Amino acid sequence: MIEQSIDNRGVATLVLARPEKHNALDAATMDALTDAAHRLGADPDVRAVVLRGEGPSFCAGGDLGWMRAQMQADAATRAREARRLADMLWALNRMPKPLIGALHGNAFGGGVGIAAICDMAIGVPGMRMGLTETRLGLIPATIGPYVLARMGEGRARQIFMSSRLFDAAEAVDLGLLARVVPPEELHDAVENEVQAYLACAPGAVAAAKALALDLSGAVTPEQVDHSIAVLCAQWETPEAREGIAAFFAKRPAAWVRQKSA
């Protein structure tokens, strides 16, 4: 789930609050973030939104129990659950308030997708990030449009297919993080960004964000629908069944090849 607070300046803070699960995304968390994006976006008193994670990780991606349930579900259920994640990303991305991400620890899969829809994200040294879906026989489909929009095709293809982990410094080079600061400076770095927005006209900020999305060739509903369709198709493959089964059995998947001696 998430925790939410709004201070007397109109700065809202959303906290991914499943630290024991490394803030993995389950259905309840996705729905809560979608609802928060709609409510905060419609609240004229809210000037900026900060998103962070509680505990050792920012967001470890999809919840393992949720993923296991998808493996056992029918096609219609999988499509509905993919739409749930897509709706969350769409709502956060289109929220007419500046969204500032404060990242630490691990950010995998959907956690990278959340970072990609932040108007800016700040990280700390020692982070590990990655699109790890292909290790499971899946693809980073639903988050894909936002990752491509953030990084551009050339940079995204460096990490989109290999499930390779990368650190905060590389995330800056990829365009995913704006900058990296020491952990003890993360709060102040985010606060500096918030203060900049508090000096701006809120209606103009919302209009500028909408214009940036429109001029950039922003993610479209058609792209979202396509990402859901290809993810559902991938779930039906033998690779997906093998990858998920191997993960929960804590064994290498059938396609894993070790480095030559």
Describe each model-derived feature in a short phrase.
Residues 1, 245-261:
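Terminal low-complexity tails and localization/encapsulation signals of metabolic enzymes
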